[in-house]
């Protein structure tokens, strides 16, 4: 298939590009400049320079694809509008061209705190974390565009680890810098997680199977934040030393994202087997040493 990936050099996007190219697909990554376009060659993909805020820079390219995967996002007010513009542009291109599948990247924060009962794809998004309060409307834009010709899917990844690290890299970084992995609050909140390689395979499965609707990309393990920090500390050679940062102190430094980072979530999926996917990586606690080695290699 001919597949366009936005955010193609990002943490998730680059993994998706590499997975799709390795599987024999003709992948084009939408990037912001020529330097990033050149990076994609190492992943077996082509680069195309465009700006999500400028529909004319990628609309025709998108219309000529078999599938579109939107992973790009800029965490800012302008980024929210750019995301909405991108969705509208990609959908219009899909309807005007040959596109058969469109996949949108959301996240589990739209579900808010879930409590102890596993939360599946049909759960409400009425109480999302405030920082992503806009996102359920963007999910709906994608989902209502589904038709017999166009399969639309929303992927909600858990906390991603592996490779260059994502959020988990901050625990490795603080362990190295301060001698203890720092986390926010009491650490009893649970994190649904997924290795970046498993997530890339997940996207490939959704595209190849023309998945429709909402999918939770999680490995089935809800791990307490304090345990994640301790495992990161041990992997970083700090003997499991951790330090809790009070929520109020973290909010003063980091803003509203803190309330998303301390969500207590138990997320599950009833749909992964529909697309023939299961995680190959055990879980973060069992793979912290490997994840740290990957992070160090990517940071070198």
Residue spans for each PLM region:
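Mid/C-terminal beta-alpha module of Rossmann-like enzyme folds, strongest
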Residues: 2, 15, 200-257, 296-299
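Active-site "gating" loop of Rossmann-like NAD(P)-dependent oxidoreductase/epimerase domains
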Residues: 108-132, 147-148
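A conserved pocket-lining segment of Rossmann-fold NAD(P)-dependent short-chain dehydrogenase/reductase
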Residues: 173-194
């Amino acid at each position: 298939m001919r597949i366009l990936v936005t955010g193609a050099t990002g943490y998730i996007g680059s993994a998706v590009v590499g997975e799709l190219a390795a599987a024999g697909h003709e992948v084009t990554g939408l990037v912001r400049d020529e330097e990033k376009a050149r990076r994609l060659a190492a992943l077996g993909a082509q680069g195309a320079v465009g700006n999500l805020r400028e529909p004319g820079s990628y609309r025709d390219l998108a219309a000529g694809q078999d599938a579109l995967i939107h992973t790009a996002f800029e965490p800012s007010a302008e980024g929210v509008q750019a995301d909405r513009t991108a969705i509208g542009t990609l959908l219009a291109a899909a309807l005007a061209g040959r596109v058969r599948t469109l996949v949108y990247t959301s996240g589990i924060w739209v579900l808010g705190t879930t409590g102890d009962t596993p939360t599946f794809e049909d759960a409400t998004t009425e109480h999302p974390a405030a920082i992503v309060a806009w996102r359920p409307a963007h999910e709906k834009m994608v989902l209502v565009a589904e038709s017999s010709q166009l399969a639309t899917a929303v992927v909600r990844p858990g906390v991603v680890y592996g490779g260059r690290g994502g959020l988990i890299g901050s625990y490795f970084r603080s362990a190295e810098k301060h001698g203890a992995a720092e986390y926010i609050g009491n650490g009893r909140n649970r994190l649904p997680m997924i290795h970046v390689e498993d997530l890339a395979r997940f996207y490939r499965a959704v595209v190849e199977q023309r998945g429709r609707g909402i999918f939770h990309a999680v490995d089935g393990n809800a791990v307490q934040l304090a345990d994640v920090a301790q495992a990161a500390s041990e992997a970083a050679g700090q003997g499991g030393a951790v330090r809790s940062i009070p929520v109020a102190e973290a909010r003063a430094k980091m803003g509203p994202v803190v309330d998303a980072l301390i969500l207590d979530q138990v997320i599950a999926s009833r749909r992964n087997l529909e697309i023939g996917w299961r995680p190959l990586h055990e879980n973060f606690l069992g793979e912290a040493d490997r994840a740290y080695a990957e992070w160090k290699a990517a940071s070198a």
